[in-house]
């Protein structure tokens, strides 16, 4: 049966057409945007939204416009486990880009080797968006990452990690949590979900200081400041920044990546801390600039 207008997942608006660098500080040389997507045209039916195209040339133009030296492309959920556009983009820019794939747990050794050769350095599990892979096969994905020297990346609300929190503390591979745990800042710092997020990060999780526009009401995202600062305080060497471009699955006013970077001036007022978040930490975690 053909899909009707009512059953087609909601269309997302395009990203801001003119991204700019931050106005409150100068982006240091070697900076890494650790979280963005490229979007093609073939989507899985179980997706949660319908994004406009975000081709590699637009993504690279965004990196250039915002003074980013390197970038990490995260497989977008609407493409499911078809990583072909991700791999194509990584292979075209092997020195500048790394990738995070979404893969079935029983992917062949040859296919995994192809992903690694292209520049994939981790696998993403996703409990939020249709087309993602959940946490039920965490052990399988841990084993894959351990064999390949990869890490795990989680897109989830922090409180949804409660059932697997004891397991996370015993993982044999590093892991990173997207978008500061997708936490509702209105719930406050005493909310169980935030307390769990802080505990996971204190115990060794990496955290992406990304998605401020998803957590906050409006720029300049002042309500995110105490939460981001708390994360940085407990994990200054495991905090990284990401633009989340092209901001899929969002229907508010599209943010400018420069404004998202400017929030980092409030989250990390100290220039040395910002350089760790933008340069030192992500280069180490994603394997950039290795001689």
Which residues make up each language-model segment?
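Hydrophobic alpha-helical segments and helix pairs
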Residues: 108-154
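Catalytic pocket-lining loop regions of alpha/beta-barrel enzymes
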Residues: 7-10, 135-241, 290
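Active-site beta-loop-alpha junctions enriched in small/polar residues
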Residues: 37, 76-77, 102-106, 126-130, ...
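Conserved, mostly hydrophobic/aromatic
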Residues: 35, 63, 86, 115, ...
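Hydrophobic faces of well-ordered beta-strands that scaffold small-molecule active sites
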Residues: 31-36, 71-74, 97-101, 123-125, ...
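Short, acidic/polar
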Residues: 53-62, 105-115, 137-138, 192-193
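Mid-to-C-terminal alpha-helical segments outside catalytic/metal-binding sites
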Residues: 2-30, 53-70, 236-238, 252-291
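Divalent metal-dependent hydrolysis catalytic cores, especially in the metallo-beta-lactamase
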Residues: 46-80, 96-102, 120-128, 150-152
């Amino acid at each position: 049966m053909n899909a009707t207008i009512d059953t087609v997942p909601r269309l997302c608006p395009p990203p801001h057409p003119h991204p700019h660098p931050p106005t409150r500080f100068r982006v240091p040389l070697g900076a890494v945007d650790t979280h963005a997507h490229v979007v093609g045209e073939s989507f899985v039916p179980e997706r949660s939204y319908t994004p406009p195209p975000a081709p590699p040339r637009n993504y690279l133009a965004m990196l250039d416009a915002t003074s980013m030296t390197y970038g990490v492309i995260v497989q977008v959920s609407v493409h499911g486990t078809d990583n072909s556009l991700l791999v194509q983009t990584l292979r075209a820019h092997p020195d500048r880009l790394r990738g995070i794939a979404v893969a079935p747990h029983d992917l062949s050794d040859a296919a995994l080797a192809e992903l690694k050769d292209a520049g994939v350095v981790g696998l993403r599990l996703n409990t939020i968006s249709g087309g993602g892979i959940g946490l039920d096969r965490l052990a399988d994905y841990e084993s894959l990452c351990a064999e390949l020297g990869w890490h795990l990346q989680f897109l989830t609300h922090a409180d949804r990690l409660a059932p697997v929190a004891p397991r996370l503390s015993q993982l044999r591979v590093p892991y990173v949590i997207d978008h500061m745990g997708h936490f509702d800042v209105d719930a406050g710092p005493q909310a169980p979900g935030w307390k769990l997020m802080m505990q996971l990060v204190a115990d060794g999780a990496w955290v992406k200081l990304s998605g401020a526009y998803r957590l906050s009401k409006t720029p300049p995202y002042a309500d995110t400041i105490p939460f981001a600062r708390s994360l940085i305080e407990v994990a200054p060497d495991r905090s990284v920044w990401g633009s989340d471009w092209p901001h899929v699955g969002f229907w508010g006013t599209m943010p400018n990546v420069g404004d998202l970077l400017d929030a980092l001036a409030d989250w990390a007022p100290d220039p040395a801390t910002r350089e760790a978040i933008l340069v030192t930490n992500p280069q180490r975690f994603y394997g950039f600039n290795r001689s």
